[in-house]
Amino acid sequence: QFGAGLSSSDGVVVGVTINQPNFLGTGNRVNAQVNTGKTNTVYSLSYTDPYFTPDGVSRGFDVYRRDVDTSSNNSIGTYNSKSYGAGVRFGLPLSEKDFFSAGLTGDFTKVDLFSDSPKQYLDYCGNSSGCTSNSLQLAAAWIHDSRDNTLFPNKGVLQRLSAEVALPVLDLEYYKLEYKHTWFKDVTKTFTFMLN
């Protein structure tokens, strides 16, 4: 897949995605993405074995690199960052409509600051040249999906409850909880109401 767009802050944005659902005939999924713009550049690669165990537990690996360079963006202060990350994740089907996932990701970020960098960044780093900000993130999620069609649903519910914790072993410590609920109802044959 190939996509392109125009953004007031990022200029011309180009994205390329390669998705192989049956990589080399193994039944495993490989997904590679490249998204480039004037400010943000992201490279990511993921590999998933959907039948890691006989009872349907999946296992996946992810690696990524994310670069941010705001020197050409006059609307915000100048800073550069380079992030590298890698993680492992597992998925467990609980029923036909329920799914549980958990994973561990390490993120390693270097931030370069300048005299006109945002104050929040200068305060966080404690100096005007920059710093490193590393984290080890443990994440888990429960998903319930009763939609009649994943691409063009007419009725059903999609729920997602997720939690993420940065373990107290590196620079960052935080926790995040998130709940999303989307409800679909067919009003007529050609019109579906969605409440999010």
Regions found by a protein language model. Give the residues of each.
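Short helix/loop capping segments that flank catalytic or ligand/cofactor-binding pockets
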Residues: 150-152, 170-171
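Transmembrane beta-barrel strand/turn architecture of Gram-negative outer membrane proteins
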Residues: 82-88, 157-167, 173-196
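Gram-negative/organellar outer-membrane beta-barrel architecture
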Residues: 1-147, 151, 157
